[in-house]
Every structure is written in C-alpha cells, then in structure tokens.
Curated annotation (Swiss-Prot):
GO cellular component: mitochondrial inner membrane; respiratory chain complex I
Quaternary structure and interacting proteins, as annotated: Core subunit of respiratory chain NADH dehydrogenase (Complex I) which is composed of 45 different subunits. Interacts with TMEM242.
Keyword Electron transport: yes
Record-annotated membrane-spanning stretches: 13-33, 55-75, 96-116, 122-142, 151-171, 178-198, 199-219, 237-257, 274-294, 326-346
GO molecular function per UniProt: NADH dehydrogenase (ubiquinone) activity
One GO-annotated biological process of the protein: reactive oxygen species metabolic process
Keyword Chloroplast: no
Main location group: mitochondrion
EC number: 7.1.1.2
Topology term for the membrane: Multi-pass membrane protein
Organism for this UniProt entry: Pongo abelii
Catalytic activity: a ubiquinone + NADH + 5 H(+)(in) = a ubiquinol + NAD(+) + 4 H(+)(out)
Name of this protein: NADH-ubiquinone oxidoreductase chain 2
Described purpose of this protein according to its UniProt entry: Core subunit of the mitochondrial membrane respiratory chain NADH dehydrogenase (Complex I) which catalyzes electron transfer from NADH through the respiratory chain, using ubiquinone as an electron acceptor. Essential for the catalytic activity and assembly of complex I.
C-alpha cells in the first residue's frame, strides 16, 4: 500500500465506523458500512502478494453480498412501515434479512467461511483490524435493533458459531486461523446475550478486543504465524514466555483470568431469564476452544522440541519492536476478574 494513501484510508475507516455507530437512520448506517468496507480493502493488500489479493477479493465479495441483502431489507422495511429508524424494525422478514446480512459481516456461522481464509492471507496487523475494529459497526447496528430481533434466530446462529469456532480450530497449525475461529466463537457468545442484555454484549466486545489485541501483539513481536515458529520463542524472546500461556488461557475463557468474565456474566444473565439449557450447551461446546488453546500452550511452553545447537538460547538477544501497549494489555488480559462486580455494576 502506498504510504501516501494511509492518511486517507485509516481516517475513512474510522469515519465509516463512527457514522454507523452514531446513526439511527438506516441509510447513514448502511453508508458508514460501505465507507468502512471500501477503505479497508487496501489495508488487506498492504503487502502485495497473490494470497493477500485473494483474501481481499473474498472479503469484498462477502461484504458486498451482505450489503446488498442489508439494503434490500432496509428498503423492504421502509416500504412496509414508512420508517427509516434502526430501532423500528418490526417486520419479521426484514428483521431476518438484516440479521443475516450482519451475521455475514461479522463472520458468524453458517456465513463464516471467509473469516479464516481472509485472516490467513493478510499480515498480522491487518488481521488484527479485521477481527477487532471491523466488528464494531455491525455490532453497533445489532445493539440498536436488539429489542426487535427474533431471539430464536440469534440463539441458533450463536450456538452454531460456537460449535464451528471450536470444531474448526482443532486441527489448525496456523495461528491466524486459530484466532479467526476463536473470533467466530466469541461472536456467538456476544450475539447470544444480545436479546437479553445488550450492555453485556458491549462488555464482551471490549474484553474480546483486549484479548485479541494482546494475542496479535505477541505474535507480531515474535514474528510467529505457525505453532512451530511460536515454539522457538524461548530462545529469541525469553521474557515473552510467561505472557503466552496467560493470554491463550484467557482467550479460552479459563477462570480466574479476564476471559472468564464475559462468559460468567452471560451465563448469569441467561439464568436470570430462566434459561439454563442454552448456556450449559454453550459452555460445554466452548471447551473445544479451551482444548486447542491448552494444546497450543503445551506445545509452546511446556515441551521443548529437539533442536540443534544453533537453536540454543542466544547470549545476545535481538532488538525487539517497541510495544508500549503490551504491558497494560497483559495486565488487563489476566487481572480484571477480581474487579468484575464493579465492571458488571457499570454495565
């Protein structure tokens, strides 16, 4: 990507997300999504290669299809009700089409196929933006129309996303694909609680962004994209070794780490509404995610693979990239659970 284009592209992405998040008019919400999508495509092709070009095309085709479905649903809803406000979506068919379009944009199952492939084909920084920032605009629309969404449809999509996210990540060796499937699982948890308490969805989104950003910063600092490359962290960046297990376990939702907080809040919210079967199923399926994270920790931090003498610990370490955010994010990734009563009272 041309460096001269960056001062235009990144503000456009930010502006598009902001327009969608702050708009209560369907046309401006759709316009913000389009600005965001078109400006994000050059970010995916930041490092020109056939793989990144393929990823950008897949992203564009999926997002364009979702945008067409969304626009058709908006026009259909306006034809029936005469309203353009995002909170007034009472027709079940238009609501179903809107949820389908936004699920495609979020990468929820069964519209998830593009997420692992696009994440795998782009650099780590672009993958981080894809799995974090690009979720904000669609979730903001879902938040505004949470009272008019069919609960059964959302729960079906959520359980399916959690299942696909856990099942799909089991046989992966590429770290970007593992984080992509983890993102699908987290989207399932967020959307499951949306009809009951949208504020917990926002809390889950914030914690998810913190955890995913920490994981991507560690991988970028270590220049690791596969499990094998991550196993060599001990002889390059020894000080990074304690951070890897804590971050991965928190992503898997293991107590008493921060990643358990949103799951705890969601299960509690379901229990308040008299629904115990759904969170039980979701929690059991999420063990698949925890399993492949524990397996990843076992390969990187507990076992030491046979290596030649050239791979022994270096007497002089390489200069590392400056990471001013990593210490703060690591603390937030591991130590937020003790103050969870305060966080839940605010939300």
């Amino acid at each position: 990507m041309n460096p001269l284009a960056q001062p235009i592209i990144y503000p456009t992405i930010f502006t598009g997300t902001l327009i969608t998040a702050l708009s209560s008019h369907w046309f401006f919400a759709w316009l913000g999504l389009e600005m965001n999508m078109l400006a994000f495509i050059p970010v995916l092709t930041k490092k020109t290669s056939p793989r990144s070009t393929e990823a950008a095309i897949k992203y564009f085709l999926t997002q364009a299809t979702a945008s067409m479905i969304l626009l058709m649903a908006i026009l259909y809803n306006n034809m029936l009700s005469g309203q353009w406000t995002t909170t007034n979506t009472t027709n079940p068919y238009s609501s179903l089409m809107i949820v389908t379009a936004l699920a495609m944009k979020l990468g929820m199952a069964p519209f998830h196929f593009w997420v692992p492939e696009v994440t795998q084909g782009v650099p780590l920084t672009s993958g981080l933006l894809l799995l974090t920032w690009q979720k904000l605009a669609p979730i903001s629309i879902m938040y505004q129309m949470s009272s008019s969404v069919d609960t059964n449809i959302l729960l079906t999509l959520s359980i399916l996303s959690i299942l696909v996210g856990g099942w799909g990540g089991l046989n992966q060796t590429q770290l970007r694909k593992i984080l992509a499937y983890s993102s699908i699982t987290h989207m399932g948890w967020m959307m499951a609680v949306l009809p009951y308490n949208p504020d917990i969805t926002i809390l889950n989104l914030i914690i998810y962004i913190i955890l995913t950003t920490t994981a991507f910063l560690i991988l970028d600092l270590n220049s690791s994209v596969t499990i094998l490359m991550l196993t060599r962290t001990w002889n390059k960046l020894t000080w990074l070794m304690p951070l890897i297990p804590s971050t991965l376990l928190s992503l898997g939702g293991l107590p008493p780490l921060t990643g358990f907080l949103p799951k705890w809040a969601i299960i509690e919210e379901f229990a308040k509404n008299g629904n115990l079967i759904t969170p039980t199923i979701m929690a059991i399926i999420t063990l698949l995610n925890l399993y492949f994270y524990v397996r990843l920790i076992y390969a990187t931090s507990i076992t030491l693979l046979p290596m030649s003498n050239n791979a022994k610990m270096k007497w002089q370490f390489e200069n590392t990239k400056p990471t001013p955010l990593l210490p703060t994010l690591t603390i937030l990734t591991t130590l937020l659970l003790p103050i969870s009563p305060l966080i839940l009272s605010i939300s």
